[in-house]
């Protein structure tokens, strides 16, 4: 399904019931890259609770001397979460609604979590590929992501795909 369109239905791992979702979910690793105090506050909030914070490499820490140890801890946390049964696997898309403040009041944005076929992805500035970024890719950030993924048991992508659908034919109320 969707192979020619660059996507397919994924196998998703979601936290089991009983996990504190307020501490489980964190922003993407490429946010707050110049604010170590933000990430320190998140760590304080999370504490010892299961959290995706333990599964990502916040880019604020890129270039730090402890990067190899941080990657080892991330991969160990992935293995531990799987061994402890903290995740439940599901097949299929997940429908997402997000309320944002906009001009004229709150607005609901709708979306689907899908698996993208990276064979259709090209991050070069001149790309006309089916899947391409809307902003420049920072090449120096690619190597640490590859290092984390090298021994990773899980994938934690943080891609938001925008589609041209002014008539609301793909996702509509």
Predicted feature locations:
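N-terminal extension/subdomain marker
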Residues: 1-172
């Amino acid at each position: 399904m969707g192979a020619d369109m660059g996507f397919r239905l994924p196998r998703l791992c979601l936290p089991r019931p009983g996990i504190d979702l307020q501490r489980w979910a964190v922003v993407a690793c490429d946010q707050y890259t110049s604010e170590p105090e933000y990430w320190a506050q998140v760590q304080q909030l999370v504490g010892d609770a299961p959290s995706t914070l333990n599964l990502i490499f916040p880019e604020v820490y890129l270039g730090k001397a402890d990067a190899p140890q941080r990657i080892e801890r991330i991969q160990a946390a992935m293995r531990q979460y799987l061994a402890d049964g903290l995740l439940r696997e599901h097949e299929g898309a997940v429908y997402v609604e997000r309320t944002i403040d906009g001009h004229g009041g709150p607005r609901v944005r709708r979306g689907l979590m899908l698996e993208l076929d990276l064979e259709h992805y090209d991050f070069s500035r001149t790309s006309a590929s089916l899947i391409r970024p809307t902003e420049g890719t920072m090449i120096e950030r690619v190597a640490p992501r590859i290092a984390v993924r090298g021994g990773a048991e899980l994938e934690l992508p943080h891609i938001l795909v925008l589609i041209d659908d002014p008539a609301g034919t793909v996702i509509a109320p």
